[in-house]
């Protein structure tokens, strides 16, 4: 399990079409083989007690599909566990991998996915999106280059949640200049506190 990794996203020039304008951005290939991107991302997954069954299913399902899955816990059921540490560790691992040039994405699960998304987003360089349908899952990647997806395990069937996760993992970032620019503005505020118009 990856924990305690450095929290230091890359930097770039705001407003340029350079991929470095969005710290932590790793180009997502559009080429596909057997339905998967040519470069399949490493997947970091975390949950709390409310998402444990879904998490176990996803680890097995994604591993069988050829993804390298890193499980950030918990390892056993505890109805009183707290999700922040699990989700923060998954977020830290995604950012560290991306900084090292490894194509990585994250999944955080809970009852609603809301708290897990909030916790993951406290990690500098994480762009966590709550997905509740196929459109939000795909747009999170296509427009926002989200690197973590949050899903509510109590809001969907296992089949529905799996479909959302797969849509997120397989959707490429558009690389459109306007989206890179907007992501860059968020990153500037995150790292400097400056609001760029």
Task: Please describe what each predicted stretch is.
Residues 44-64:
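Glycine-rich phosphate/diphosphate-binding loop of Rossmann-like nucleotide-binding domains
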Residues 46-53, 134-197:
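C-terminal binding/interaction regions
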Residues 39-43:
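Extreme N-terminal starter segment of soluble prokaryotic enzymes
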Residues 86-130:
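Helix-adjacent hinge/juxtasegments
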Residues 60-69, 125:
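Short helix-loop-beta junction
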């Amino acid at each position: 399990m990856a924990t305690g990794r450095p929290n230091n996203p890359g930097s770039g020039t705001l407003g340029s079409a350079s991929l470095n304008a969005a710290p932590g951005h790793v180009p997502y290939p559009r080429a596909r083989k057997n339905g998967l991107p040519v470069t399949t991302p490493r997947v970091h997954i975390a949950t709390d007690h409310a998402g444990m069954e879904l998490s176990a299913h996803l680890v097995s399902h994604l591993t069988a599909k050829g993804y390298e899955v890193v499980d950030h816990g918990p390892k056993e059921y505890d109805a009183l566990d707290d999700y922040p540490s699990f989700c923060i560790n998954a977020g830290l691992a995604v950012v560290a991998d991306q900084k090292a040039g490894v194509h990585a994405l994250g999944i955080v699960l809970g009852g609603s996915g809301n708290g897990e998304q909030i916790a993951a987003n406290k990690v500098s360089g994480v762009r966590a999106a709550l997905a509740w349908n196929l459109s939000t899952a795909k747009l999170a990647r296509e427009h926002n280059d989200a690197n973590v997806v949050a899903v509510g395990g109590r809001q969907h069937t296992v089949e529905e949640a799996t479909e959302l996760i797969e849509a997120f993992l397989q959707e490429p970032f558009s690389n459109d200049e306007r989206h890179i620019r907007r992501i860059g503005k968020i990153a500037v505020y995150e790292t400097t506190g400056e609001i760029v118009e």
